[in-house]
A protein has these predicted regions:
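Bacterial N-terminal signal peptides
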Residues: 6-15
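Long, well-ordered core segments of solenoidal/helical folds
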Residues: 48-62, 112-129, 180-199, 251-268
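Eukaryote-skewed repeat-based solenoidal scaffolds used as protein-protein interaction platforms
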Residues: 110, 114-117, 121, 138, ...
Length: 351
């Protein structure tokens, strides 16, 4: 005789088929929304997310940062997060909407994309750079912003639009022409802002003054400096250009040489428990360890610098407060694969 518990289990399977199979996890709002299968972008789930993304679009045409755009916009949303290119804001929703618009043919998503694209193009400074926020807010937010790859993400998006790369084939000729011109001016400002030490070109700061192009401050612990992090994305963008100009070639080669000479060798970054029993980080001697790079380098000496909230430059990570050591990334392997990428680029350019 079948037991009562077995009968209950069978009944549950009948009334709830989902219990008999593994349900798919909902798609989170992050860069993963750009790497779904082609069929997914025409699904009801993709449309639902696209509808909420459109609902978050501002009057100006941009999007907020640090906001789950796959969820309904909150009435009490922080207006300070709106209209920015920081943390993949605006560029990520645009790339997502383009995929859904192409997959579904829905004019609503295409229109939201076009309005967002106009916002991106309107935000460009006459000299070719982009601020972190637009409309402008003042302070360091108005600087040309390479920080967290903001300008590089914008330029990569516009470059794809300009050539009609999928999923941007629905963009009309007028906007494509504007995108082409914007990329050209963007490349020009990148070349002009590359930091020069005498006759030697180096790399870039995470942010540059929009008028003088000098390396500029951001937050109290983000000084004018040579960036061992953001400069990597700039170099990769320059290497992505078809038929690079002689000036672009010089810029890439100079940056590659700077990265090679600025590596921190025989050192590892380790997490340990300090004397107070707290998790902490330090740089430790480690012969043969893979190279590391500092996020900030002195503009004159090229020495790594570490800065806490007191805005004082120090030569060692141990010299700043633990809160920053654990809460910010001062050292990393960002350019580790760059030598191989540069070598492949050289072969392509020589063809």
């Amino acid at each position: 005789m079948i037991s009562r518990s077995w009968l209950i289990a069978i009944a549950l399977l009948i009334v709830s088929p989902a219990a008999a199979q593994t349900s798919e996890s909902p798609v989170a709002w992050n860069a993963g929304v750009l790497t779904q299968s082609a069929d997914w972008y025409s699904s009801s789930d993709a449309r639902r997310i696209a509808d909420t993304v459109v609902s978050h679009q501002s009057r100006e045409g941009g999007w907020p940062k640090n906001t789950p755009l796959n969820e309904i916009a909150r009435a009490d949303a922080d207006p300070g997060l709106a209209n920015t290119f920081d943390n993949q804001a605006t560029t990520l929703p645009l790339a997502f909407l383009a995929r859904v618009a192409t997959a579904t043919g829905d004019a609503t998503y295409a229109a939201a994309f076009r309005r967002g694209l106009d916002y991106v193009l309107d935000a460009q400074y006459p000299n070719g750079g982009w601020p972190q926020y637009y409309p402008l807010r003042g302070g360091y937010h108005d600087n040309l912003t390479f920080n967290d790859d903001a300008m590089v993400r914008v330029l990569n998006l516009l470059k794809a639009v300009a050539v009609g790369q999928q999923p941007y084939g629905f963009v009309d000729d007028a906007q494509r022409a504007r995108a082409t011109e914007a990329v050209s001016r963007g490349v020009e400002i990148i070349l002009l802002s590359q930091v020069r030490q005498g006759d030697r070109l180096t790399v870039w700061c995470a942010q540059h003054d929009p008028v003088s192009l000098a390396p500029a401050w951001a937050r109290k612990f983000e000084p004018p400096s040579l960036s061992g992090s953001e400069s990597v994305g700039v170099v990769r963008f320059l290497m992505s250009l078809d038929e690079p100009s002689p000036e672009v070639v010089v810029a890439v080669e100079a940056a590659a040489a700077w990265f090679e000479s600025s590596a921190i060798r025989d050192t590892r970054l380790e997490t340990y428990t300090n004397a107070e029993g707290q998790p902490d980080r330090r740089l430790a001697l480690s012969p043969g360890a893979p190279p590391l790079w500092a996020r900030f380098y002195d503009l004159t000496t090229n020495a790594p610098i570490y800065m806490g909230r007191d805005s004082v430059a120090h030569p060692d990570l141990a010299d700043i407060e633990r809160e920053r050591r654990m809460g910010y990334t001062y050292v990393g392997a960002w350019p580790a694969s760059l030598p191989a990428e540069v070598e492949a680029w050289r072969r392509r350019v020589a063809e």
